[in-house]
């Protein structure tokens, strides 16, 4: 059986979502790689991305009753992943939020199925954790329970303290976070594919400086 995490990273490279080189992160760090999930922006790539999410979610073992996608990136992720989960025999409802509340029609900030039971949040990455915190507030305000967070990539790097943004979410809320792939998987990709050999040492150095266990 192939490693879907490695397949996901190779797919991300093919879509130019994952790039190697010299980049500056929002935190001002010089990074040897860059991941931009916004470039999964056509039908086929979104379909394949949703398949990876569905597989990752199922293999995580997280128990959930529905999906929630925080605006804006999470909206399409929740809808597409719900369809792929349904193909795998897991048919669950999904919902998302608006950035601005509507005062007409159905109104409010929530769209889709009512938030009930155990709600799995789905997003592209966890950077500062702001989107997750806002999602948790929305879910709990509706009387539902956050079940965990599914993301595309865990960069596994320190935030302002010693913990990564993912670890901070896990610690603060006691929620499991299920990434399709992580920095460790990226490191394995570089080790096993000589054509990317020139980036192995820069990624190793970056992990040494900013990485978490």
Curated annotation (Swiss-Prot):
Record's protein name: Orotate phosphoribosyltransferase
Source taxon at top rank: Bacteria
Binding site for 5-phospho-alpha-D-ribose 1-diphosphate: 26, 72-73, 98-99, 102, 104, 123-131
Function: Catalyzes the transfer of a ribosyl phosphate group from 5-phosphoribose 1-diphosphate to orotate, leading to the formation of orotidine monophosphate (OMP).
Database matches in CDD domains: PRTases_typeI
Cofactor (UniProt): Mg(2+)
GO molecular function: magnesium ion binding; orotate phosphoribosyltransferase activity
Annotated binding of orotate, by residue: 34-35, 127, 155
Organism: Neisseria meningitidis serogroup B (strain ATCC BAA-335 / MC58)
Subunit structure: Homodimer.
A single GO cellular-component term on record: cytoplasm
């Amino acid at each position: 059986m192939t490693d879907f995490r490695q397949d996901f990273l190779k797919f991300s490279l093919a879509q130019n979502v994952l790039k190697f080189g010299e980049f500056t992160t929002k935190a001002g760090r010089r990074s040897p790689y860059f991941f931009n999930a916004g470039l999964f922006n056509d039908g086929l790539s979104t379909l394949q991305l949703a398949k990876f999410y569905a597989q990752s979610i199922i293999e995580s073992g997280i128990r959930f009753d529905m999906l929630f996608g925080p605006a804006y990136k999470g909206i399409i992720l929740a809808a597409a992943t719900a369809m792929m989960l349904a193909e795998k025999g897991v048919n669950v409802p999904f919902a998302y939020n608006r950035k601005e509340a509507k005062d007409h029609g159905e109104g409010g900030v929530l769209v889709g199925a009512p938030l009930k039971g155990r709600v799995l949040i789905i997003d592209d990455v966890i950077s500062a954790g702001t989107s997750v915190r806002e999602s948790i507030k929305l879910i709990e305000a509706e009387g539902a329970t956050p079940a965990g967070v599914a993301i595309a990539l865990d960069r596994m790097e320190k935030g302002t303290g010693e913990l990564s943004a993912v670890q901070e979410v896990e610690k603060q809320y006691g929620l499991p976070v299920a990434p399709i792939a992580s920095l460790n998987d990226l490191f394995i990709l570089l080790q096993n594919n000589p054509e990317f050999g020139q980036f192995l040492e820069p990624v190793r150095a970056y992990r040494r400086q900013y990485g978490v266990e």
